[in-house]
Amino acid sequence: MKLIYLILIIFLNTNVFSEEQNKSHFYIVSDKLIITEQPLTSEFIGNVYARNAIHHFYGNRILVNYDNNKKIELITIIKNVKIVRSNEEIFGDRAIYDLKLENIIVSGNVLVKKNGDVLRGSQLIVDLINSTSTIKGNKDKQVSVKVAN
């Protein structure tokens, strides 16, 4: 019975907090939340916004996968992806934030806006450990860049 009340509170609130090893928290809001026990996942649907101390994520759906210790392992953002980082906006069709590898992979119609510059490609890999970003084209279209003066 206590479990039913807990799930009901989570559904009504549609907010999730998770403490990571580095003491950062994720705050997530959406129109709807579905929690699955085995494997432990949270699916946020509709007008989804998620943030931690550094990143802001927007999308139609966000899937949160947890490890065996109930720590967030992967965050997948699906459709109308927007990621806001310090002085940078990233757009795409899908993004995967791997908290263990500390990278973000954005795919499908990737657009990056930073300091007036605009980059377009099919895939972006952001390495948060080494502070590097790699944008790739595909066989039909190369990477394009518009540099601001």
Label the model's feature ranges.
Residues 1-149:
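Mature-chain termini and adjacent capping regions
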